[in-house]
From Swiss-Prot:
Named cofactor requirement(s): Zn(2+)
This protein's pathway: Pyrimidine metabolism; UMP biosynthesis via de novo pathway; (S)-dihydroorotate from bicarbonate: step 3/3
This protein's encoding gene: pyrC
Catalysed reactions, as listed in the record: (S)-dihydroorotate + H2O = N-carbamoyl-L-aspartate + H(+)
Keyword set, alphabetical order: Hydrolase, Metal-binding, Pyrimidine biosynthesis, Zinc
Organism whose genome encodes this protein: Vibrio vulnificus (strain CMCP6)
InterPro entries: Amidohydro-rel, DHOdimr, Dihydroorotase_CS, Metal_Hydrolase
A single Gene Ontology CC term: cytosol
Subunit structure comment from the entry: Homodimer.
Any one GO molecular function term: dihydroorotase activity
Pfam families: Amidohydro_1 (PF01979)
UniProt name for this protein: Dihydroorotase
Record carries keyword Hydrolase: yes
Length: 342
């Protein structure tokens, strides 16, 4: 197959950052996506509906397309209230709230210290139909970084699913076979996003032959057996799994340093990267469901009505891309992509 036409895709998990870099991140995310769910871990974090609407306006100021629409999310803290959830839902622009365990990832220091503290908030979310997005890692120092996801599933997420059976939950950027099994076995209100980089790479790519800082992300890349489980889930056609890039830009100097930031930038070629994975798995026919159908179906939103076309046509990814007054090194920098969006 050299040409593939699919319903216009959406990205259900992306970081655009804020300020002058929006000119670059919005350009990339809006190129062919219909919608993108914008993560709220900016500085300061987006903790109220007013902040979410103001952030949306800043994003829209750089949107040069007609088809793209940003969807907003709230950042949950120990101090989030049920009233704030109801207010956010009523705004019409905020579709989800994000649970970051405190310290789990970039700009998550304001996150939730104990999930029991936000049980009244989760109850309100269940009542009004607001989705819960979860960064599924524990942050206690006695848990190995490669085991954080599994421990979170057992100790934190399983009780939430049991206590709030009608709450729609998205386990974001899953990285383990354990997460795949958890989502498959959970009730119909539990789904997951999978990133392109966790499908394409494993920890060997990051660590063998020298440390590759641009592969460093959180949750961290796991061993290849987990990678294979993710590929199987993503390409299976199972409606519980859908596209969320977790594209997370950092300036080159912040990545290539003695204490580098976590995050990989993939928004420049997201659906093209996924197409390679699906082609290698012999499942290109399932790309449309993963990229364009399963996400809006789970969120209770209409599918996009128009299409995009991918063609098998190699093109070079630049060594770096503009990022405000700095540069970002994208995934596949200096290499060729196999698929291109016409």
């Amino acid at each position: 197959m050299t040409t593939l036409t699919i319903t216009r895709p959406d990205d259900w998990h992306v970081h655009l950052r804020d300020g002058e870099v929006l000119a670059d991140t919005v350009r990339d995310i809006s190129r062919y996506n219909g919608r993108a769910l914008i993560m709220p871990n900016t500085v300061p974090p987006v903790t109220t509906s007013e902040m979410a609407l103001a952030y949306r306006d800043r994003i829209q100021a750089h949107n040069q397309t007609e088809q793209f629409s940003p969807l907003m999310s709230l950042y949950l803290t120990d101090n989030t209230t049920a009233d704030e959830v109801r207010k956010a839902k009523a705004s019409g622009a905020v579709v989800a709230a994000k649970l970051y365990p405190a310290g789990a990832t970039t700009n998550s220091d304001s996150g939730v210290t104990d999930v029991k503290k936000i049980y009244p908030v989760l109850q309100a979310m269940q009542e009004v139909g607001m989705l819960l997005l979860v960064h599924g890692e524990v942050t206690t120092h006695d848990v190995d970084i490669f085991d954080r996801e599994k421990t979170f599933l057992d100790n934190v997420l399983a009780p939430i699913v049991q206590d709030f059976p009608d709450l729609k939950i998205v386990l974001e950027h899953i990285t383990t076979s354990d997460a795949v099994v958890f989502v498959k076995n959970a009730n119909e209100n539990v789904a997951a996003t999978i990133t392109a980089h966790h499908l394409l790479y494993n920890r060997n790519h990051m660590l063998v032959g020298g440390i590759k800082p641009h592969f460093y992300c959180l949750p961290i890349l796991k061993r290849n057996t987990h990678q294979l489980a993710l590929i199987s889930a993503a390409t299976s056609g199972n409606k519980k799994f859908f596209l969320g890039t977790d594209s997370a830009p950092h300036a080159k100097g912040a990545k290539e340093s003695a204490c580098g930031c976590a995050g990989s930038y993939t928004a420049h070629a997201a659906v093209e990267l996924y197409a390679e994975v699906f082609e290698q798995a012999g499942k290109l026919e399932n790309l449309e469901a993963f990229a364009s159908h399963n996400g809006p179906d789970f969120y209770g939103l209409p599918r996009n009505q128009d299409t995009i076309t991918l063609v098998k046509d190699a093109w070079p990814v630049p060594a770096s891309m503009p990022f405000g007054g700095d540069i970002v090194v994208p995934i596949r920098a200096g290499e060729n992509m196999e698929w291109k969006v016409k």
